[in-house]
Amino acid sequence: MWLLLVTSVLSAFGGAHGLFGKLGPKNPEANMNVSQMITYWGYPSEEYEVVTEDGYILGVYRIPYGKKNSENIGKRPVAYLQHGLIASATNWITNLPNNSLAFILADAGYDVWLGNSRGNTWSRKNVYYSPDSVEFWAFSFDEMAKYDLPATIDFIVQKTGQEKIHYVGHSQGTTIGFIAFSTNPALAKKIKRFYALAPVATVKYTESPFKKISLIPKFLLKVIFGNKMFMPHNYLDQFLGTEVCSRELLDLLCSNALFIFCGFDKKNLNVSRFDVYLGHNPAGTSTQDLFHWAQLAKSGKLQAYNWGSPLQNMLHYNQKTPPYYDVSAMTVPIAVWNGGHDILADPQDVAMLLPKLPNLLYHKEILPYNHLDFIWAMDAPQEVYNEIVTMMAED
């Protein structure tokens, strides 16, 4: 969506080549897949396909060990990383190795697994439905919590022989964790600790332009966005990332457009990596996922998707209205980091969440941080990642 703003500006002022400054050095990872990005930096990579109970085929990636500890071939503690909304596993590996959480954990001795939610670039297959069908896209974060997380975590536990794993979630990755671990006690028992970055349980106070979407009637949202994909990665995104936003005079425009949706923290964004960030983002989701977030923004509650009528809700939930999720039912030990300039996971929403967490181990608010700083900030290792490594080692 913010990319469209950039495109409009380019159209108004004419062409990206030459006029807006010379092109910066290109990073080859911008055009790589997940496994290629991992091996490019000298780390081992494994790729798996996990089939969910309802037939979705998820791409799951593994970094079994780091460059510094390859000689230790015994069992390692497992760290599972789950991305946020319209994102993918690449979020954890798009910075340099000393600034990317997946690589940092691998070098710290962890068996690192990267998940992908249904519908994104690396999980766009189903046993029964084609991605061209409406049926394929009839999901939101409800199904990610109900089917994707259990299938992926069970696969990892079986593959590694570890009974419990560490779970790191960002943005919507925390949302599906809250839902899955509060409604599925058997799954919750497999989680050592939950590390929540920019946690989202409610969006009552969000100031993001996405809030405006909640004011649009649902029937009109369907007219505007359709009933299939929302913000899939395409050629335009790739072009903007590799040919436009990497130009000296346009990186500021691109970063400001991004900040409008996620909050401002100009000094912490590595603009030299813009082509990698935009070469893999947005990674897409369903329009139903978008509609679900609009529903939450309007209600201010964490609630299952409203299928539109009492009859449809009865078919899905055996009740006329969508059930609410009770975060306080989650007993998994949790550590929380949030940003003071995050307009998606607003500090007021986080303040509402914290008292509901019965096993809160740690909370830190980083005042300058926006929503994306937790995955891309240049000082993320000092502010967040080193603390995660320390806490994992203590458990």
UniProtKB/Swiss-Prot annotation:
GO MF: malate dehydrogenase activity; triacylglycerol lipase activity
Intrachain S-S bonds: 245-254
Keywords tagged on the record: Disulfide bond, Glycoprotein, Hydrolase, Lipid degradation, Lipid metabolism, Secreted, Signal
GO cellular component, one term: mitochondrion
EC number(s) on file: 3.1.1.3
Taxonomic source organism: Mus musculus (Mouse)
Gene that encodes it: Lipf
Principal subcellular localisation of the protein: secreted
Enzyme class: hydrolase
Domain AB hydrolase-1 intervals: 81-376
Subcellular location: Secreted
Active site residues of this protein: 171 (nucleophile), 342 (charge relay system), 371 (charge relay system)
Signal sequence residues: 1-18
Recorded catalytic activity of this chain's protein: a triacylglycerol + H2O = a diacylglycerol + a fatty acid + H(+); 1,2,3-tri-(9Z-octadecenoyl)-glycerol + H2O = 1,2-di-(9Z-octadecenoyl)-sn-glycerol + (9Z)-octadecenoate + H(+); 1,2,3-trioctanoylglycerol + H2O = 1,2-dioctanoyl-sn-glycerol + octanoate + H(+)
Family as reported in the entry's similarity comment: Belongs to the AB hydrolase superfamily. Lipase family.
Positions annotated with a glycan in the UniProt record: 33, 270
Statement: the UniProt record of this protein carries the keyword Protein biosynthesis: no
Function: Catalyzes the hydrolysis of triacylglycerols to yield free fatty acids, diacylglycerol, monoacylglycerol, and glycerol. Shows a preferential hydrolysis at the sn-3 position of triacylglycerol.
Name this protein carries in UniProt: Gastric triacylglycerol lipase
InterPro entries: AB_hydrolase_fold, AB_hydrolase_lipase, Lipase_euk
